[in-house]
Amino acid sequence: MPKMKTKKSVAKRFKLTGTGKLKRAQAFKSHILTKKSRKTKRNLRKTAYVSETQEKVMKKLLPYV
């Protein structure tokens, strides 16, 4: 049986933490920022974590990470 391939699109967007959670960046932070408040933009800088239901799917796409 051949090796499983890592989905590179997932590998570049998500990082695995020490506890096994998947860390991701927030969406809505790239453009159209003038109508967003200072507080909103500041909160979008923070990292977010993938939900437990999505985490099961994502970990199948990252077999060697």
From Swiss-Prot:
<dbReference type="InterPro" id="IPR018265">
    <property type="entry name" value="Ribosomal_bL35_CS"/>
</dbReference>
<dbReference type="InterPro" id="IPR021137">
    <property type="entry name" value="Ribosomal_bL35-like"/>
</dbReference>
<comment type="similarity">
    <text>Belongs to the bacterial ribosomal protein bL35 family.</text>
</comment>
<dbReference type="GO" id="GO:0003735">
    <property type="term" value="F:structural constituent of ribosome"/>
</dbReference>
<dbReference type="Pfam" id="PF01632">
    <property type="entry name" value="Ribosomal_L35p"/>
</dbReference>
<dbReference type="GO" id="GO:0022625">
    <property type="term" value="C:cytosolic large ribosomal subunit"/>
</dbReference>
<dbReference type="GO" id="GO:0006412">
    <property type="term" value="P:translation"/>
</dbReference>
<dbReference type="InterPro" id="IPR037229">
    <property type="entry name" value="Ribosomal_bL35_sf"/>
</dbReference>
<protein>
    <recommendedName>
        <fullName>Large ribosomal subunit protein bL35</fullName>
    </recommendedName>
</protein>
<keyword id="KW-0687">Ribonucleoprotein</keyword>
<dbReference type="InterPro" id="IPR001706">
    <property type="entry name" value="Ribosomal_bL35"/>
</dbReference>
<keyword id="KW-0689">Ribosomal protein</keyword>
